[in-house]
Amino acid sequence: MAVYDELAGRLVLITGGANGIGRAMVEAFHVQEAMVCFCDLDEKAGARLSKRLGDRAEFAKVNLCREAGIKRWVAHLAKRHGDIHVLINNAARDPRIALEDVTAKAWDDLFAGNIRAYFLVCREASLHLAKGASIVNFSSITFYTAPVNMSAYVATKAAAIGLTRSLARELGHRRIRVNTISPGWIMTERQLSDHVTPAVKRQIRMEQCIPDLNQPDEVADVALFLASDSSRAVTGQEILVDRGWVPG
């Protein structure tokens, strides 16, 4: 892991930080000596992670589908810790639902958590962002690979890319950068337990240019770069972390 000295002491907000890629990012920013504030619905996992990391790691249970909860969380952190330097919108669900089974409610619920929440967190955080701050929104290579039974999810991830590009233009005059990370199939605990069979692993290795399995900490490394001053000239962009499943 690279060390970015400028991240020490900076306030970092991460949604969906209790497990998987989110947890890897919380841990990575904590190593950089940043003040890491993260939210999740998984209260047990979030509290456990915060306790393990100790100082400079603060967890809150927040339902990102509720605007009032987002407002309270962001305002509280800004009042307690000051300007926000890094915001990472990571929280999302990726259900596998056939087209004919996607109800209007299921569609609306998925958009509420996967993209409406991103917008609301960005809106509230924008009131407290430091000059030169960095926002990272998560999309997915499924926008390009278009897997079956994930049409609603893929639509939310397409929207995340559009949100990033628009906000990069809107916030650029404040020297605020906005970028997207689109991970490939990452070997989180949930993916390994729910979806990644031996056959899937073979498929992954076959599809990728580099036939190694993607790990959460590798995504966290890219998030660190986008949060650091080393990426000060990078905004409105999308970085795919997929070992070449989707060649550029």
Regions found by a protein language model. Give the residues of each.
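Alpha-helical segment proximal to the catalytic Tyr-Lys
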Residues: 127, 169-173, 232
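Substrate-binding pocket helix/loop in short-chain dehydrogenase/reductase
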Residues: 98-99, 103-111, 200-204
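Residue(s) in the substrate-gating loop at a strand-loop-helix junction
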Residues: 140
